[in-house]
Amino acid sequence: MDVKKLLADVTALPGVSGHEAQVSAYFAEQFRPLVDEVTVDAMYSVIAHKKGNGPKIMLCAHLDEIALMVTHIEDDGSLRLGNVGGVDPRILPASRVWVHGREKLFGTIGALPPHLMSAADRANNYTLDNLHVDIGMSAERAKELVRIGDLVTFDGPARELLNDQFSSKTLDDRSCVAILLRAAEMLQKLVCDADVYFVCSSQEEVGGRGAMTSAFAIDPDLSVVLDVDFAETPTCPPRSALPIDAMIVTHGPFVQPKLNQRLIDCAKKHHVKLNANVASRSTGTDADEIGLSRAGVPSVL
């Protein structure tokens, strides 16, 4: 499996929370030759089952992405936006986007230039209220091709960086779905001492709804959730993020301590470098929802 090509392929697909049909169909086909059974549920989560002898283990990563949605078409043809998931408006000015209307339309996100702002305005951050998408057409034409509720996704093509680094949109959390695919490939010809369920969950970015329903359907004995975290950069406050040279194990009330220790011991045995992260309340990931399924599921993140 060419991991770099896989990352480029899986991050290019649109799969906004609540609109994952296309990307879930893609992942279902990728898993099909690697496992015994693949299903896509009503929430568009993909459940790939490798049958084995032992407890049911749920390995979960989410396939949905944050994005934007058209809320209004202005008289000049520009589009107003709402968010789907946790979009930070500060990064949006001058961003390139795709509007998924009756046709797929390219656009750029515009904002009032700082030269025309008052001092008070310049002191405030951008919000969705003062941003718009310019698709370069009249209001009449825009209304023929775009409807309220159409999705707007980011144009962030995959780029390979130096030192085996990689840049793309949707690495949260398609990079972890790629890990699930690679794991399924590695286990393909082995007889496992566990019943393994690879779950590509939907709607994580809007509350973990796909993981919740998948965990209810599977009723796993334990779960391992894969997600991304904050990477250390020059502007990060001390101790607020971690370097990207190791995997991160989360500690906190939403993860099961004994299972966490088994994960850490296994990593040490195989010389896998780990960093530690603390989530003192909820984790903000699918682990929160899976852990509360049915009578409870021991989970690690």
Predicted regions and their residues:
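N-terminal hydrophobic/helix-forming segments and targeting peptides
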Residues: M1-L301
